[in-house]
């Protein structure tokens, strides 16, 4: 029989996975604790007991996923073009390796594109964004004259939105060619 701490950990993992799916599918505002609880097969009170509130759960997931994604790219040292290609390939590999990776990507895109993300979460994400390998990649590419001019934050959002759509097409087998080089052209100065 599992110990109390093992049962709690298993319950927390079920809540966490269910919350990622619900937030990714419905967005922050349209997701309720009841939605998450139903998906996890538990009561809403257990979510509050283990995570505090919907906002705290969303905040934890947001920061965890953002940190995981940034860690995938923390070791990139090539020029901006090769880094872009590597980012696309690594994300695609993660999707192929992990059955639920697309759910995490759905959540992340919902997080960065939603107008309803709580302010404190946005503030923490903005702090993380300042250390983002993609932002640094864009800024370095602009300084070298290789990347189009514009606000790095807006280009960062364009990067992730385009990448998400490209990977979705690959994931759903609707893209007949490797996206790596095509994707880099989105940011390239012509």
Predicted regions and their residues:
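Hydrophobic alpha-helical connector segments
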Residues: 60, 74-101, 154-159
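N-terminal intrinsically disordered/low-complexity leader segments
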Residues: 1-10
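Amphipathic alpha-helical segments used for helix-helix packing
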Residues: 96-117
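Helix-turn-helix
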Residues: 10, 14, 18, 22-56, ...
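C-terminal peripheral helix-coil segments that are non-catalytic and often amphipathic
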Residues: 2, 85-93, 131-143, 160-190
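Short, basic, alpha-helical segments at the C-terminal edge of helix-turn-helix-like DNA-binding modules
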Residues: 63-69
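Amphipathic alpha-helical packing segments from all-alpha helical-bundle domains
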Residues: 70, 117-144, 153, 157
